[in-house]
From Swiss-Prot:
InterPro entries: Allergen/soft/tryp_amyl_inhib (IPR006106), Allergen/tryp_amyl_inhib_CS (IPR006105), Bifun_inhib/LTP/seed_sf (IPR036312), Bifunc_inhib/LTP/seed_store (IPR016140). Belongs to the protease inhibitor I6 (cereal trypsin/alpha-amylase inhibitor) family. Five disulfide bonds, which are essential for the inhibitor activity, are probably present. This is Alpha-amylase/trypsin inhibitor CM3. Its main location: secreted. PROSITE patterns: CEREAL_TRYP_AMYL_INH. Developing endosperm. GO terms for cellular component: extracellular region. It comes from the Eukaryota. CM proteins would be involved in the cooking quality of pasta. One of its GO terms (molecular function) is serine-type endopeptidase inhibitor activity. Keywords: Alpha-amylase inhibitor, Disulfide bond, Protease inhibitor, Secreted, Serine protease inhibitor, Signal.
Length: 168
């Protein structure tokens, strides 16, 4: 009788352990758990700078963007530096998933605080002459050797199928 209950208990423990292991493996890069949900504001700035060009006050950008730190003359390289720092803070196995999440986010609704870099939402902005699709192509390259040179899952330096989020 004791053997039967011990075997049942061991079997139950094994099943629970396998369920927990499967859940943690599949959800290891969940937004809000593995990385912040208001992530990569500097990468958004850098992507806009590289794909849409440098904008000046009076352009068709939202008013809050014309005063963003990346548009000040003399320091355009800082956007790349800060973007790469933000990406480096995300674990290697979650970088591509963070970029997928970044692409899928809605348009930002409030300005970036230049002191803290905080923004209510991140994501790419659909602009006249610079659609989000064009920006996606550049986002895919952020981890590549010519940009931030950061390893991703499987120790490669690219993110395949970035526009297809795995967390949906």
């Amino acid at each position: 009788m004791a053997c039967k209950s011990s075997c049942s208990l061991l079997l139950l423990a094994a099943v629970l352990l396998s369920v927990l292991a499967a859940a943690s493996a599949s959800g290891s890069c969940v937004p809000g758990v593995a990385f912040r949900t208001n992530l990569l504001p500097h990468c958004r700035d850098y992507v806009l700078q590289q794909t849409c060009g440098t904008f000046t006050p009076g352009s068709k950008l939202p008013e809050w963007m014309t005063s963003a730190s990346i548009y000040s003359p003399g320091k355009p390289y800082l956007a790349k530096l800060y973007c790469c720092q933000e990406l480096a803070e995300i674990s290697q196995q979650c970088r591509c998933e963070a970029l997928r999440y970044f692409i899928a986010l809605p348009v930002p609704s409030q300005p970036v605080d230049p002191r803290s870099g905080n923004v209510g939402e991140s994501g790419l902005i659909d602009l006249p002459g610079c659609p989000r699709e064009m920006q996606w192509d550049f986002v895919r390259l952020l981890v590549a050797p010519g940009q931030c040179n950061l390893a991703t899952i499987h120790n490669v330096r690219y993110c395949p199928a970035v526009e297809q989020p795995l967390w949906i």
